[in-house]
């Protein structure tokens, strides 16, 4: 397997945690210290990578674990 290619899809379920915490995307972005545009890219799954420091800040702001917001779905072959 090439290092740049995944055999599946990594999905960010930030919307679910935002709803549970009654928090807006803008409020989360401010707490994390990134732009709303960049948070939107993460939320929509268009990001190619995420820094651990950003993931840490998101988890702290949402009071959750990484597994609460990240899901892996394998490709069906």
Regions found by a protein language model. Give the residues of each.
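The alpha-helix within a helix-turn-helix
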Residues: 18, 29, 59
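Residues within the helices of the helix-turn-helix
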Residues: 15, 26, 56
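A short, Lys/Arg-rich alpha-helix, primarily the initiator
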Residues: 1-23
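Short alpha-helical DNA-recognition segment
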Residues: 23-41
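DNA major-groove recognition helix of helix-turn-helix
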Residues: 43, 54, 73
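Short, basic-rich loop-to-helix N-cap that marks the start of a DNA-contacting helix
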Residues: 46-57
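Short C-terminal boundary/hinge segments that cap the last helix of small helical domains
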Residues: 63-77
